[in-house]
UniProtKB/Swiss-Prot annotation:
It is found in: Nucleus; Chromosome. Keywords: ATP-binding, Chromosome, DNA replication, Nucleotide-binding, Nucleus, Ubl conjugation. One of its GO terms (molecular function) is DNA replication origin binding. This is Origin recognition complex subunit 5. Pfam families: AAA_16, ORC5_C, ORC5_lid. Its main location: nucleus.
């Protein structure tokens, strides 16, 4: 369809395969289709656009929002019921608790005149969350066409491969369709398609080319690149607006935007500030080369003990384990730094990067640097989990490892010094590299 080619860019092959699988409205389609690919590879957009453009009866459900079996099944049934009763405008809420009830109610809903002779499509986005629900749910959806004896196709959209889904007991195999990552040429074409009407397509394409030249090595997420393109474009065309350069003066435009793109690279994915705050920061910033206001330690707020946990984690990451006695025991005797040095330790630990440490060592350092007695309560452990969620600590290894969890501290020296100052702790005195 020519209309689809203009709306769905760089996914012609996938659209063609899906159209051939869907077939005619009254034909029985493939019972289940598994679509997978990395984030922002167009899975959801292509599927929704295709179903809407072809005006096929479908329901779209996000498995993150419907996090229980009952929520998921009721959402599907009520959306289908709304489709079937759209003509008379009245519909009642359906309740459903088991998959057996779902099959029975699904048969009733799809007997409506406008759903009877055509394929109904159920789209389950973020389908990887189905694995955390009841064991019979995934095999049931894969065989829904057979169980309900209805013309229905279930589409699973996921970021992980089918092999991670397949139950050990076996199941009906879906048709698997892969959405590859967009190439740099694809991204150039898609992003250039968004050009503002007040500027020429060539001018915006040149800007996108510069943007991808800076960000493509660190970010290939279409959503993030599109956000960055919108955010930084006013700064790129600023010399043109002021009359200081023409649209073809790419060298001058590049010199103007370069420091701001470098600054934006520090916050890819982070969303530390809103778009409006970013624009205000660009207007107020007299020194574009300085990374002002974007560092997390300028506005991060942590509970009192979380700060000490983070400090203890930093010390555990950057101090050799055998130096703990020197720093944290009162009667350790006089030990010179030269006694610790080995040939491979001539390089600073800060240059080598953070090293993993066990939970026991973290707690031992925490108890020695906090003045008051801290009991190892659930509150302390929940604060450690919160620091992992905030990505100030990272969990190293697998959750099911037998020797207990290991962590790494991911913050910089400037960050931890700023945190330490808020609790009057001189962290430099406790760092092996600064002896």
């Amino acid at each position: 369809m020519p209309h689809l080619e203009n709306v769905v860019l760089c996914r012609e092959s996938q659209v063609s395969i899906l159209q051939s699988l869907f077939g005619e409205r009254h034909h029985f389609s493939f019972p289940s289709i598994f679509i997978y690919g990395h984030t922002a590879s167009g899975k959801t957009y292509v599927t929704q656009t295709l179903l809407k453009t072809l005006e096929l009866p479908h329901v779209f459900v996000n498995c993150v929002e419907c996090f229980t079996l009952r929520l998921l099944l009721e959402q599907i049934l009520n959306k289908l019921n709304h489709l079937s009763s759209s003509e008379d405008g009245c519909s009642t809420e359906i309740t459903c608790e088991t998959f057996n009830d779902f099959v029975r109610l699904f048969k009733q809903v799809t007997t409506a005149e406008n759903l009877k002779d055509q394929t109904v499509y159920i789209v389950l986005d973020k389908a990887e969350y189905l694995r955390d629900m009841e064991a019979n749910l995934l095999p049931g959806f894969l065989r829904l066409q057979e169980l309900a004896d209805r013309n229905v196709t279930v589409l699973f959209l996921s970021e992980i491969v089918w092999e991670k889904f397949r139950p050990n007991t076996g199941c009906f195999e879906p048709f698997v369709l892969y959405f590859p990552d967009y190439s740099i040429g694809n991204l150039q074409k898609i992003l250039s398609h968004d050009h503002p009407p007040e500027y020429s397509a060539d001018f915006y394409a040149a800007y996108i080319n510069i943007l991808l030249g800076v960000f493509y090595t660190v970010c290939r997420d279409l959503k993030e690149l599109r956000h960055l393109a919108v955010l930084n474009f006013p700064k790129y065309c600023e010399p043109v607006v002021k009359g200081e350069a023409s649209e073809r003066d790419t060298r001058k435009l590049w010199r103007n935007i370069e420091p701001h793109l470098k600054k934006a690279m520090q916050t890819v994915y982070l969303r530390e500030i809103s778009s409006s705050q970013w624009e205000k920061l660009q207007k107020d910033d007299t020194d574009p080369g300085q990374l002002k206001g974007l560092s997390a330690h300028t506005h991060v707020e942590l509970p009192y003990y979380s700060k000490f946990i983070l400090i203890a984690a930093y010390l555990a990451s950057y101090n050799p384990a055998r130096t703990d006695k020197r720093f944290f025991l009162k009667h350790h005797g006089k030990i010179k730094k030269t006694n610790f040095l080995k040939k491979h330790e001539k390089t600073s630990n800060h240059l080598l990067g953070p090293k993993p440490f066990p939970l026991d060592r973290l707690l031992a350092i925490l108890y020695s640097i906090v003045d008051s007695r801290v009991a190892p309560t659930a509150n302390i452990f929940s604060q450690i989990t919160s620091l992992v969620t905030l990505q100030l600590l990272t969990l190293v290894g697998h959750d099911d490892q037998l020797d207990g969890p290991k962590y790494k501290c991911t913050v910089s020296l400037d960050f931890i010094r700023a945190i330490a100052r808020t609790v009057n702790f001189d962290i430099i005195k406790y760092l092996y590299d600064f002896l």
